[in-house]
């Protein structure tokens, strides 16, 4: 009987889905002005935004991408740990991506900053679109929006830190650690984050000094470490990590790894001097940083997007489709809260959002053609309704179908 009920449920669901798919296809033409809409507008020209643009272009969505020309990895020498692009300069990667995407003629790119964005309701609030304004005052509209606006690293004002960030001073071991392996390393940041970096770097560097800048005796940091790593003091001794609690006054570059490198081994040999307030100094070849980030753009706040309750510098998304709290908005790359910040993740999230957006948009248009469209309709709603209709999880379904 269970199999029969399941079969009937599947037939009913298939029938309902077929009625939607059979609806007339509504294709919007390329926009000619503010009164015409794009299928989607993507804001951000890094890996996540370009990935979304590419995926949407491949299904002939009319999409416009805005790129203001500021990138988190803009200062880094090369991209690493990205298959087929290991060692490529970030600007070369972006140029190649643009060239390849250009074959999808329903896509376009504008190199200008977006300053305003708002959601506009129409038809009594049952439908909506997004209005985007760039810094020249030009307006554009779209059915959906993808934000790949990224984050900013909030660096202290220590002289020499900002100027050298991304070149021998990095925040991601996978992005730059291999090129500085087996070199004297410094950890820059509060005490609470030292163990995280030690665990990440132990296979690459074993001469480590943590420059905690006066936080060694911070009660808050110590309590945090006691909770997260109960044996952290013993672990630091085990790894022979030194804690330097002096206040850092400046960092001087002594050698540039872009000029001193071994191209056969892919090693870069930077060298720095850390100067302290007491007049003493220490030399290191490379640094990893543990400083906070913040949203690069205020566009998420203009739309009223919810933040992650714990990591408040991140925009909360539904990981299944990168949907933000406002229907029609997708947030990809470092800006969202799905827990990873690197180029591979950025492209994955852009791809996932593009697929969800494409399907959601077509489902909405099919429903509109049938006169059933309402503001609450979404791809996620369809998924939930399908689960209710079937009433079984995946493992139960496999077990039922396996019975004779």
Curated annotation (Swiss-Prot):
Its EC number is 1.8.1.9. SUPFAM superfamilies: FAD/NAD(P)-binding domain (SSF51905). GO terms for molecular function: thioredoxin-disulfide reductase (NADPH) activity. The keyword Secreted applies. It comes from the Eukaryota. FAD binds at residues 67-75, 334-343. One of its GO terms (cellular component) is extracellular region. Keywords: Disulfide bond, FAD, Flavoprotein, Glycoprotein, NADP, Oxidoreductase, Redox-active center, Secreted, Signal. Residues 1-22 form the signal peptide. Disulfide bonds join 172-175. Belongs to the class-II pyridine nucleotide-disulfide oxidoreductase family. Homodimer. This is Probable thioredoxin reductase ARB_06224. The lineage of its organism: Eukaryota, Fungi, Dikarya, Ascomycota, Pezizomycotina.
